[in-house]
């Protein structure tokens, strides 16, 4: 069996990715590593939550030792975890930095230590900035 490890797998994008890989790769076990905060819910995975092929780990990306431990022997690592909603970042700056910056560093360090060969990093539409009226003229 292949091991697919998805951070943020209970969030909106992450849960859709989890279901996609679950259905597409029947010979795999999916590990979802998610802090499960305001923007995530195990209910997003209710269609597959009873399967023995799905393991949900409620942990934070800032916990490097747990991340390294649980991601051992991973064949494909998908990093979809992030604090989202730009407005929240103004009031929760430290939380955003811990998750989005330190958390991503921890993901990359754990993948390096565990010799993960395939990594997919999901980002946000916010990296593109605003679209101006003349952008598509």
Feature roles, as predicted:
Residues 1-137:
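N-terminal Rossmann-like NAD(P)+-binding domain of SDR-like oxidoreductases, especially those catalyzing
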């Amino acid at each position: 069996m292949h091991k697919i490890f998805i951070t943020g797998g209970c969030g909106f994008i992450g849960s859709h990715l989890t279901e996609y890989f679950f259905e597409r790769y029947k010979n795999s076990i999916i590990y979802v590593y998610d802090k499960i905060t305001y923007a995530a819910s195990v209910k997003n995975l209710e269609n597959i939550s009873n399967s023995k092929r799905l393991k949900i780990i409620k942990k934070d990306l800032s916990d490097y030792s747990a991340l390294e431990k649980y991601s051992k022997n991973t064949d494909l690592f998908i990093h979809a975890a992030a604090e989202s909603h730009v407005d929240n970042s103004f009031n929760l700056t430290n939380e955003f930095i811990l998750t989005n910056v330190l958390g991503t560093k921890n993901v990359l360090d754990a993948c390096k230590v565990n010799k993960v060969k395939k990594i997919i990093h999901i980002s946000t539409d916010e990296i593109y900035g605003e679209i101006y009226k003349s952008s598509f003229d």
